[in-house]
């Protein structure tokens, strides 16, 4: 038996530049429009934050988890440069959902999804609050990986090649810097959470992100947490939900 909206979640598809993107919309109890979080996974997206979606739903939030073009069942070729457009398409989809309060849409991004949240929010005023954890705000460091490492860590899961991916990384690193985007988010609330044991994105980058952001930025370091907060998920969930409740619903 497949879950339906009455059971708290439903499958969704929506269009982005002619490509059909797939996702799951977790729906809080009640028919009235609810505040909603857009969840952005990283690259390739092994950690999909399903636990956070359930926690948000249990606390009265809707949550949409979707997949960018070219990964995890979404159509098209994977391209870092088009991910912000996919995020905008997801916002368009949410804004048309009757059980979504279009005036209370937030975004939560992890790793590369944190970068996507930052660069999209800089030009997308419909995002009322922005939260990131383990954010790869500056993707330049990834460009130094070998082609074999890129294939092993990323492209074997994606509809692209190591060579194409390297070109995308270089272009994004030069033209779409998440650290630079952070200042444009002000005065909207921004939450930056980072683990001190993150081996993919050094905590120094998160501290620089805090410096670049405006006074509405809330910065939290979690001692011993790794890139995916593997052993700190409950703490992460409570932190994010509590902050969102304050930032969006007051």
Functional labels for PLM-detected ranges:
Residues 199-205:
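Conserved alpha/beta-hydrolase "acid-adjacent" motif
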Residues 34, 41-45, 196:
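Active-site glycine-rich loops that stabilize anionic/oxyanionic intermediates
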